[in-house]
Amino acid sequence: MLNSVPEDDAPAPARSRMPPEERRRQLVGIGLGLLRERPLDAITVDEVARRAGISRGLLFHYFASKQAFHREVAAAGLRRLHRAMWPADERPADERLRGAIDGYLAFVERRPGRVMEMAGGSWSADPELAAILRDARATIADGLLAAADAGRDAPADGPLALLRTQSARAWLAFAEQLALDWVAEPSVEREALVDHLEASFRAATG
């Protein structure tokens, strides 16, 4: 669960000792909370430290730089997207692809600004951050393929397998933009959009 985020004029919480990993999780959680309000590159370490009730210098004890902190926040946000698509409860094989697409769309509905930034914002300006995003997209595309292939034979390697992987990654860029456009201007009912995305993924990947 995200940490509660106080108002800007609220006093900083009293400083308390925490184990290092717990403190890191707290700081990343505050960053995720701020990411609901503003772009990643507009999140300052001073504000994060103030909301955590620690000094700016102590924050840098846990993260080597502001960029390193931003990367941790971005990676945590992408893990949340992954959990939204593939929750812990295992779905029946024939429902996995649709369930993952539905979870993706729900994530976009809740956080359109974050997804828009992932699609073409400051995340692509930092090479290391861009690599984190690229790896996350590849993992999502592979997961969608596995969901589509559940219960049926599919090529595991060779040119056709590579083409299907490339198609899944290209489809993800298409779905990203379509979902953002739909959130901004709903053109069809939500279920119809999920139907369309599922059908287009199966058509693209064979």
Q: Where do the PLM segments sit?
A:
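N-terminal intrinsically disordered/low-complexity leader segments
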Residues: 1-22
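Amphipathic alpha-helical linker/stalk segments
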Residues: 14-15, 37, 73-100, 144
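Pre-recognition alpha-helix immediately N-terminal to the DNA-recognition helix
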Residues: 25-34, 80, 99, 103
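Short helix-capping/turn signature of helix-turn-helix
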Residues: 63, 120-125
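Hydrophobic alpha-helical connector segments
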Residues: 72, 86-113, 154-161, 167-171, ...
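Short, hydrophobic secondary-structure boundary micro-motifs
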Residues: 116-119, 191
